């Protein structure tokens, strides 16, 4: 396995989470608000302390120095707030690596990021996360504030970044249909725990209060 994590816990937020991810795999994390998706990404990235073991290609990525870390993993936070008066191209360059195609950023590269729309800022931050071509992408709601077309384009881009590569991605996402469409595996989180794998079974109704009827998610009525 490329990534192996065990016993990850953050006080009050994450309880004894363990998972493995293979090279080339895109794993989506789904769950209600506050279920622990962001906390799991934090634990893997070494944000906020906590306990547990993480091994990425034989090393603990949380112990890497600032020069080594971007090649091992990058973390995209859910927040798109960017107070720094940097040009978009300079912010992307801070991530290291080269440019990223497929995000249509040419028109905004010479604009300050604090003047961009939320969707544009999101695409700039995604470009920064992808630029160093890390082994592991930790992406928290990467499709947030993007229009439906861009949501599709972005998830397809992430898939193409992993294709045939010794790289992997964990993506926290609220859209269950998108998770089913693009993920190799889906981990369902609830109350700070990895509660189940996949979206087939009674746990979906219990955790989300929805069920699939004629191919569409609908509230449970019975």
Predicted regions and their residues:
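Helix-to-loop junction immediately C-terminal to a conserved catalytic motif
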Residues: 45
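Catalytic Walker B motif of ABC-type/P-loop ATPase nucleotide-binding domains
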Residues: 137-140
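ABC ATPase nucleotide-binding domains
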Residues: 205-222
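H-loop/switch region of ABC-family ATPase nucleotide-binding domains
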Residues: 173-174
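Conserved ABC ATPase "signature" region
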Residues: 98-109, 114
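ABC ATPase NBD coupling module
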Residues: 60-74, 79
């Amino acid at each position: 396995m490329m990534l192996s994590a065990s016993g990850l816990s953050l006080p009050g937020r994450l309880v004894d989470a363990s998972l493995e991810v293979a090279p080339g795999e895109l794993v989506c994390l789904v769950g209600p608000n506050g279920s622990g998706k962001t906390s799991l990404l934090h634990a893997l990235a070494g944000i906020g302390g906590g306990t547990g073991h993480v091994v990425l290609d034989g090393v603990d990525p949380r112990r890497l120095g600032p020069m080594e870390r971007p090649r091992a993993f990058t973390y995209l936070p859910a927040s798109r707030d960017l107070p720094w008066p940097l040009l978009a191209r300079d912010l992307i360059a801070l991530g290291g690596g080269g440019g990223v195609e497929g995000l249509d950023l040419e028109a905004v590269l010479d604009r300050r990021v604090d003047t961009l729309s939320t969707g544009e800022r999101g695409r700039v931050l995604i470009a920064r996360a992808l630029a160093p071509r890390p082994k592991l992408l930790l992406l928290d709601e990467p499709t947030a504030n993007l229009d439906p077309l861009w949501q599709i384009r972005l998830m397809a881009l992430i898939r193409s970044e992993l294709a045939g590569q010794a790289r992997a991605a964990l993506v926290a996402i609220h859209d269950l249909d998108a998770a089913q469409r693009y993920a190799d595996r889906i981990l369902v989180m609830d109350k700070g725990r990895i509660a189940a794998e996949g979206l087939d079974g009674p746990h979906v109704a219990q955790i989300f209060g929805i069920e699939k009827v004629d191919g569409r998610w609908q509230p449970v009525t019975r």
